[in-house]
């Protein structure tokens, strides 16, 4: 992971933390284990915050299951902002 991806990850984690209330370091550890399942309301708020933060559209699956894949989000954002 290069510096741009790492910085993007930390911004994504910050946005997720603002919704879930979980500590950023704990979220990073959670995402090392795989995607994080959240309820529908949190999912939509996380997607909205991340899209607003990076001024982009993530085209996330809005039908569920409501899993947050931090690495996939970072990949989408870095490809959009090349």
UniProtKB/Swiss-Prot annotation:
The UniProt record lists the keyword Oxidoreductase: yes
InterPro entries per UniProt: DUF6137
Alphabetized UniProt keyword annotations: Antibiotic biosynthesis, Flavoprotein, FMN, Oxidoreductase
Superkingdom, taxonomy of origin: Bacteria
GO MF, one annotated term: oxidoreductase activity, acting on paired donors, with incorporation or reduction of molecular oxygen, reduced flavin or flavoprotein as one donor, and incorporation of one atom of oxygen
Pathway: Antibiotic biosynthesis; butirosin biosynthesis
Principal EC category: oxidoreductase
Signal peptide, first to last residue: none
Catalytic activity of the protein: 4-(gamma-L-glutamylamino)butanoyl-[BtrI ACP] + FMNH2 + O2 = 4-(gamma-L-glutamylamino)-(2S)-2-hydroxybutanoyl-[BtrI ACP] + FMN + H2O + H(+)
Entry's Gene Ontology BP terms: antibiotic biosynthetic process; protein homotetramerization
EC numbers, comma separated: 1.14.14.13
Oligomer and partners: Homotetramer.
Known function: NAD(P)H:FMN oxidoreductase component of a two-component system involved in the biosynthesis of the side chain of the aminoglycoside antibiotics in the biosynthetic pathway of butirosin. Together with BtrO, mediates hydroxylation of gamma-L-Glu-GABA-S-BtrI.
Name of the protein described by the UniProt record: 4-(gamma-L-glutamylamino)butanoyl-[BtrI acyl-carrier protein] monooxygenase BtrO
Species: Niallia circulans (Bacillus circulans)
């Amino acid at each position: 992971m290069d510096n741009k991806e790492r910085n993007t990850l930390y911004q994504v984690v910050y946005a997720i933390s603002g919704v879930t209330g979980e500590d950023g370091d704990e979220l990073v550890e959670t995402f090392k284990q795989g995607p994080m399942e959240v309820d529908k309301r949190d999912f939509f708020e996380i997607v909205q915050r991340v899209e607003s933060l990076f001024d982009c559209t993530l085209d996330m699956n809005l039908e569920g299951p409501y899993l947050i894949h931090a690495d996939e989000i970072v990949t989408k954002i870095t490809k959009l902002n090349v």
